[in-house]
Each structure stands twice: as C-alpha cells, then as structure tokens.
C-alpha cells in the first residue's frame, strides 16, 4: 500500500514540479533576472511519512550558467525576489498571515522596483506584508509607511521607528 501511494505522490510531484518551475522562471524574467532559470529536483530519501523524495530548488541567475542549489548560488537580493515570486504564485494556497521582505529590491532599478511593489501589494490584499526598502517605486505601493531613524550621542546609537503621515510619505 505504501509503495503504491508513494509512487502516485512521486508522479504528482513530478508534474507539479515542471509547472511550478516554469511559473517561477517566468516571474524571474520580470524581476531583473532575465535569462534566469528555476528548476525543482526531486531528491530520493528513505521512506517516510512524506514519501520517498524531497524537493530541492535549483537556479541559474543568468543565461549560459548551469543550475545549482538555490541556497548556494543566489545572492541575497535574488533569493528575496525568488521568494517573492514563490509567495505570489502560492498565495492562494497558503495561510501565512505575515510576510517580511528585507530589501527585496536590492540591486534592481526603478522598473523592477515597480514590479516588486505591485507583487507585494497583491500579496498584501490577503495578508500583512512588511518590507524594508530604499526604492520609492516599492514604497509607493505600500498602505502604511514607517521610518527607521538612528540617533547617536557618540557613545551609543539608538534606533527609533515612527509612522509617517501622508505629507511625510512624499518627502
């Protein structure tokens, strides 16, 4: 019984992996990773309650580069943008109440910043999204803005967080 169930699960995973990889690869093209590729590798594991394989995410950030494990080759900004793409693609099927993105726009320009901002705004329709950003294109998509200010007296540095009013948001 287990072997038959595991075989069915593997078949479903293979089919889903192809669709998911194609969707993430498409999102990468709009997130300043032109020519990049995303793949899902099914890695055999000993029999367990989750089947006989686990999923490994692979990526190539540029054309002509072989795919490698995502965790080993992605920069912080690439990892954040791929995470954003994955959350956007899976948001209908997950119930994560809060997402936090730290400089997801790192290393990108204005046009990509607009795409990133729109994707986060879409996610924000069904959950809370917090984002640390320096790009006005990303910030413009937010509903509320907080400013982090650091103050130093020469001995110690203290950070303050304050909510911005509509006038302060455009400064």
What are these regions (language model features)?
Residues 1-46:
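Charged, surface-exposed helical/loop "interaction arms" that form contiguous linear patches used
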Residues 18, 106-114:
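Conserved D-loop-proximal element of ABC-family nucleotide-binding domains
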Residues 40-44, 59-63, 84-88, 150, ...:
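Flexible glycine-/small-residue-rich
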Residues 102-103:
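Walker B catalytic acidic pair
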Residues 55, 111-171:
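C-terminal lobe/lid and adjacent interdomain/linker elements of RecA-like ASCE P-loop ATPase modules
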Residues 57, 61-64, 77-99, 123:
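GG-anchored amphipathic helix commonly corresponding to the ABC/SMC/Rad50 NBD signature/C-loop
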